[in-house]
C-alpha cells in the first residue's frame, strides 16, 4: 500500500521550529529580515511572492517586497541589490524568477552577498554544497525541503539508489548533491537520457523535476520506491498535476508526495527557515 507524504504537515513542524527561533532572536533584539525583489508582473510569481510575504509576516519576520516594472534595467536592479547587501536589517535577499530579457540572471545571482543568498544559488554556496564543505551556508530550498521530508518519514538515503530526473540549478543539481552527501548512489537523468524510464525503474528514491505533466507513470516506478514529485503542471483540463501520474503510482510506490500538498509547502517553509538561519549566522560573524 502506498503511503502519502504530507508536505503540509512536515512544513507545519518546520514553521513551528522557525517561529521559536524567531522568538529567541527577538529576545536578543534581532528580527530576521527578507527582501524579495520581483521584476515585471508574471502572475505565478506574484502569487508565490505574496505567499512568501504572508508567511514571513506571520512568523514575526521583517519582510520587504520590492515590486519593479518590467522595464527595469540591469544596472537599476544591481543598485537595489547592493543597497540590500548593505542593509543590516535584511538577512536574506531573493530575486524572483523569471526576469525580463534585458537582465542577465547569472549576473544578478552573483551580485547577491553569499551570506544573504537565501535561495542558495550563488556559486560560492553551490560550490560549498558540491564539495560538502563544513560550516554554515544556505542550500537551495526545494531540495533541502525534500531532504527534511525524507528524514521526517524515516527515509535514509545512505546505500540507496537515487535517480533525479531534471538537471536545473534550482532543483536537479542541488538535489543530486544533497543525496550524494547523504551517501546515496545518485544518477541524474534528463531529456537526453537514453531509456529514461528504465533508469527511473532502478530508483529506491525517485525525484522528478521536469515540468512535464505525468512524465512518469506507475509502470516506471520500482515497487516500494519513495517518489518525490516536484512538478507543478496543468493537465488538458487545467487541473494542477505533477510530473508523476499519481493515480497509476498507487499500490506501486512505497511513499509518494501529492501535487498539490507535497513539495510546495516545504519550499516556502524552508525559505523561512533559511532566512532565520542567515540572521543567526550574521549575528555570530559580526
Swiss-Prot record:
Presence of the UniProt keyword NADP in the record: yes
Pfam families: THF_DHG_CYH, THF_DHG_CYH_C
Membrane spanning residue stretches: none
Record's function text: Catalyzes the oxidation of 5,10-methylenetetrahydrofolate to 5,10-methenyltetrahydrofolate and then the hydrolysis of 5,10-methenyltetrahydrofolate to 10-formyltetrahydrofolate.
Protein family membership: Belongs to the tetrahydrofolate dehydrogenase/cyclohydrolase family.
Subunit structure comment from the entry: Homodimer.
Protein name: Bifunctional protein FolD
